[in-house]
Curated annotation (Swiss-Prot):
Gene name of this polypeptide: Sox14
PROSITE patterns: HMG_BOX_2 (PS50118)
Annotated source species: Drosophila melanogaster (Fruit fly)
Gene Ontology molecular function terms on file: DNA binding, bending; DNA-binding transcription activator activity, RNA polymerase II-specific; RNA polymerase II cis-regulatory region sequence-specific DNA binding; sequence-specific DNA binding
Annotated compartments: Nucleus
Protein known as: Putative transcription factor SOX-14
Record feature DNA-binding region, as residue ranges: 187-255
Basic and acidic residues: bias regions: 130-145, 322-336
Bias type Pro residues, positions: 52-71
Top-level taxon: Eukaryota
């Protein structure tokens, strides 16, 4: 149906859609004008009959309201409704801001159609989008689908989230920002103007440069925001204020409480997780018409974890989470523990020193506590060192190595220490395994005159004890097993001095007492049994004792108890076969000491065995302290040994005050 221009009947004018601007030609009003309307709905099919538009009767004022449109066909009504309602924001929120933050050059006016009587649709329409694309790409920044509101030649693509909030919504701020759910009890602060602007701009940057890192995007956004003028920032400031009010409605009791930043190490800093504007790029082909999957302001809502892309526009943790979800277990653990096999751990293995230190290792510094051999337990080594000087003991290893066959009596089959079976089990790869066999091949030295002076010093303490089980080398100290402590041994009379600290007897080293173990039958079961050899190091101990003899002058019986220095002889050194009492000269008093009592020498049966004698009838005087007094006409200095006076807990300085002895002068040696 074609309307003629000179039609006499008056038809009602066309009702315009809000936001459109009618274009009136600058010709005479009598001629009809063709109106071009920009539409977003699909173009009609080719076989459909084009509907006619009645001519527009201009009024003197262009802003006059047109009259209502007459009734049309159902197809025409559907087309008009699609053209009138293009976005829910235009209806739901009449106060939707028309922002002009980014003014663009006005589009070139579309060419008007010729002066024909028929109205044809514009040929500049975009291809009709699909329903899923219409629902999923309502954000204003999607290319090719911008919703334009033409008003006075200014185009704008800004539609904020506050315009999409339903009137009766209980969560208006969450609906406006489409924020994701956080941990329970955590409420995010309302977005400021920069966050509103950067959320929309980030989406555009990610579309142009999808490989750009988040940190670089943030720097670029900050630089651009500083370059914007106040007028350009005004729409975002208004939107931020609206979001703040919506935030107050949703969270009425919210109060911002900033928390102190925790000090973190550089390696523990989490990557930036602000990737809301870089997502949902791969969701455009999803045929989901639900409103919960709408992308508003460049963000996505439901199902975002399963639809993350691996673009670097997103946070660095997204790709890491995807790698973890893929089941990749090829990563190395944080700590690697190196475990040794059971064959490498053997508690019975002992690493022996080299060949030059083997003798010194066994006889000078260390003592074998339990040295076990084969099943017969036939040979043992009892290395009980004597109490000789320390400086002579350092050369013991070399001496024993040179003259060992002399002490063994020339028996080539004897061995020192552990038997060959135990040596082969404990030290199979040691090059010193055959050292003992080579020592036995040395010819014995039977003539003692050929021995050096150094060897002769050790002969009194060495004993060759031949037995049926074999030869045993014993290095014993005098009376080691008889008494817990030894008698002092003086070298000569010249070495006796008054100061006990300077005497060699005060510098004696206590003998090493080995922890001897017997070989029982269960410990020596078979040839294949190997036992762990234990060694013990006994540190030398030095006991220092100062003895001061105070001899006061005068007294009641000073007439017959006055002695001179020439009346005394030097106290000789006690030999091994002499009495244990060092007071053995003719002019010295024959007084012995037993416990805390003085006894006469005639009552002493054996001076070396005080504990086995009975001195009940011979006790001169008994004292329990250190001030000892003895009634004796032949009084002299009482020399007490280390055994006679054990160390007292009060100290090592012992003072003996013999008030009963009267001397003409102090006696000093």
């Amino acid at each position: 149906m074609i309307a003629k221009p000179n039609q006499a009947t008056t038809e009602p004018p066309l009702s315009l859609r809000p936001g459109t601007v009618p274009t009136v030609p600058a010709t005479t009003p009598a001629r009809p004008a063709t109106i071009t309307i920009q539409r977003r709905h699909p173009a009609p099919k080719a076989d459909s009959t084009p509907h006619t538009l009645p001519p527009f009767s201009p009024s003197p004022s262009p802003a006059s309201s047109p009259s209502p449109a007459p009734a049309q066909t159902p197809g025409a009504q559907k087309t008009q409704s699609q053209a009138a309602i293009t976005h829910p924001a235009a209806v739901a929120s009449p106060s939707a801001p028309v922002a002009a933050a980014a003014p663009k050059t006005p589009k070139t006016p579309e060419p008007r159609s010729t002066h024909t009587h028929t109205h044809t649709h514009s040929q500049h329409f975009s291809p009709p989008p699909r329903e899923s694309e219409m629902d999923g790409e309502r954000s204003p920044s999607h290319s090719g689908h911008e919703m334009t509101l033409s008003m006075d030649g200014i185009d704008s693509s800004l539609v904020f989230g506050s315009a999409r909030v339903p009137v009766n919504s209980s969560t208006p701020y969450s609906d406006a920002t489409r924020t994701k759910k956080h941990s329970p009890g955590h409420i995010k602060r309302p977005m400021n103007a920069f966050m509103v602007w950067s959320q929309m701009e980030r989406r555009k940057i990610c579309e142009r440069t999808p490989d750009l890192h988040n940190a670089e995007i943030s720097k670029e956004l900050g630089r651009r925001w500083q370059l914007l003028s106040k007028d350009d920032k005004q729409p975002y400031i208004i939107e931020a204020e609206k979001l703040r009010k919506l935030h107050m409605i949703e969270y009425p009791n919210y109060k911002y409480r900033p928390q102190k930043k925790q000090t973190r190490s550089p390696g523990s800093l989490k990557p930036n997780q602000d990737a809301d504007g870089c997502e949902a790029r791969n969701d455009t082909t999803n045929n989901n018409n639900s409103l919960t999957t709408l992308a508003i302001n460049g963000t996505t809502t439901a199902g975002r974890k399963s639809k993350r892309s691996t673009s670097t526009c997103q946070s660095g943790s997204a790709s890491k989470r995807l790698r973890n979800d893929s089941g990749d277990t090829s990563s190395k653990p944080k700590y690697e523990v190196k475990m040794e096999s059971a064959e490498q751990l053997n508690s019975a293995d002992i690493i022996l020193p080299s060949a030059d230190n083997l003798i010194s290792y066994q006889s000078s510094e260390y003592l074998p506590l339990s040295t076990l051999s084969n099943a017969d337990c036939d040979e043992k080594l009892h290395s009980e060192l004597s109490s000789g000087p320390l400086e002579s003991r350092e050369n013991l290893s070399e001496v024993v190595n040179r003259f060992l066959p002399l002490f063994l009596g020339g028996n080539e089959d004897s061995q020192l220490g552990v038997s060959s079976l135990t040596q082969s089990q404990h030290n199979q790869s040691d090059p010193t395994a055959g050292l003992m066999d080579n020592i036995s091949d040395i010819s014995p030295i039977n003539d003692r005159e050929e021995l050096t002076e150094e060897v002769m010093r050790y002969l009194p303490y060495l004993e060759v004890n031949p037995s049926s089980d074999g030869l045993t080398l014993k290095v014993e100290s005098s009376s080691l097993l008889g008494k817990p402590l030894n008698e002092p041994v003086f070298d000569s009379e010249d070495n006796i001095v008054n100061d006990a600290n300077l005497h060699s007897a005060s510098h004696q080293i206590p003998p090493y007492v080995p922890d001897s173990h017997d070989c029982f039958a269960e410990d020596c079961g078979g040839d294949s049994s190997s036992h762990q050899v234990e060694f013990e190091v006994v540190r030398p101990q030095t006991v220092t004792m100062t003895m001061t003899c105070t001899l006061p002058y005068g007294g009641p019986d000073a007439g017959h108890t006055t002695f001179q220095a020439d009346d005394f002889n030097a106290i000789p050194s006690a030999a091994e076969d002499s009495e244990c009492s060092i007071l053995t000269t003719s002019n010295s008093p024959q007084i012995g000491f037993n416990g805390s009592s003085f006894v006469e020498a005639d009552a002493i049966g054996s001076t070396c065995t005080y504990a086995q004698q009975d001195y009940t009838g011979s006790v001169i005087e008994t004292h329990n302290d250190l001030n000892y007094a003895a009634h004796d006409n032949n009084g002299a200095l009482l020399a007490y040994t280390f055994e006679d006076l054990p160390p007292q807990p009060t100290g090592s300085h012992l003072e003996f005050n013999t008030n009963k002895y009267e001397f003409a002068s102090y006696y000093k040696m």
